[in-house]
């Protein structure tokens, strides 16, 4: 959607049940960041393609693995096990979890264990003021 002076921004449609969803990738000076936004299972293939080889994948982590979150939320969000699968399939270098609910915040160890079943790269939780690159 944008390309100028080495900065390239790419976007593809995600899927968040009946709400609009967009997945973004930003490439600049040999580095890349992909932002999942809120997506459900129907957006996973698009996210995996656009995130391929990203240095950082920022993934919204709003639910726990089934059945530990309200069932209706799984039609809107991606479970930790799937976050790990997508991160591994896209071969991303690092994962940053954002859009954290209170349940997620209270279950960080379980969340990381679930992701680690398929993704072995660094996993970090977003917080106010966090800087990921100098």
Where are the model-predicted features located?
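Core dinuclear metal-dependent hydrolase active-site scaffold
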Residues: 1-52, 128-134
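Cap/insert and terminal regions of metallo-dependent hydrolase folds
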Residues: 41-130
């Amino acid at each position: 959607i944008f390309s100028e002076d080495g900065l390239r921004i790419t976007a593809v449609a995600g899927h968040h049940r009946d709400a609009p969803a967009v997945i973004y990738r930003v490439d600049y000076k040999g580095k890349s960041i992909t932002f999942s936004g809120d997506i459900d299972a129907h957006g996973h293939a698009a996210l995996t393609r656009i995130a391929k080889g990203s240095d950082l994948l920022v993934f919204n982590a709003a639910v726990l693995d089934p059945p530990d979150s309200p069932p209706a939320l799984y039609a809107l969000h991606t479970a930790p096990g799937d976050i790990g699968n997508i991160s591994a399939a896209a071969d991303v270098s690092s994962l940053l979890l954002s859009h954290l609910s209170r349940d997620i915040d209270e279950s960080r160890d379980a969340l990381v264990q679930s992701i680690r079943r398929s993704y072995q790269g660094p996993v970090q939780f977003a917080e106010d003021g966090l800087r990921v690159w100098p």
